[in-house]
């Protein structure tokens, strides 16, 4: 029905004032966007001066109507809704009744406003249409930046700044132009952003492995659970360093995305670590020797809260062991020269290290000031 390999090659159509009869009444929808004849986006418009929240309530009422088109017709394929009164424009994902409610207390599923890459809001319907609704842009939003949480039967939409961050990482990797960091404020959904970046890299045949690296065991478990919430069976638990090494050397597609702690990774790579020394004493191949064939592979490392544990020997070990790797960091509080406190000693010269020193360039920023 739909070309999912190249969404831009599908046929896009616009239908105005679509009318559908229900069991008890009829409903008329202002604008419907179709992909290959399948309704994908519904737009409800209000006149200037009337709150677009009236349109939101109207959609909720439509969905509550017995025998409504969202359950008995092709409207069940609608992915997202857009509401506007011309100067204010919002959009939100289609969901089942459990996650779809709106009342005077604003008990509502997440509502979004579009924004430019510099985070400036795009609210006027004309500007919104120019930015959000071009055929390829809309198809990309639906195909790449909406996440179905199957266990909760809930659809999530990535916010604009999350999309820009993922696209910046993706472009940096496609152009193979070094490392970078994402500065997104605490609580802005970095786990979802990093999940999407990691899983899109899984589709890139030029990348051998993608590792999402955290600095504490509890974050390892928490991140793994979140990744698997977004996509069931996305990552497996690495109970110890040996399990991590097995997945690193595995050619199984399921092991292409790995969540681990920086401590496990450091123990595996450092030939002077206790584990590697003990294996050598027993005549067993060390972890670092097992991983040696990966040294010429294109690897991607994404570090969570990269301001915490990226200063030190482990970071240098990773960069030295994987010379073709690209490293990306997520942080809510980057280290700048004015707040740098950790000194890096190289060639007997001590200097303060910043986030930019380690990750080269800021790829995207979203801060609340």
What feature does the model see in each segment?
Residues 1, 71-73, 236-241, 346-351:
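Short mixed-charge
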Residues 217, 238-247, 262-267:
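Conserved helicase motor
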Residues 15-18, 25-27, 63-69, 241-247, ...:
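Short alpha-helical segments and helix-capping/turn motifs at coil-helix boundaries
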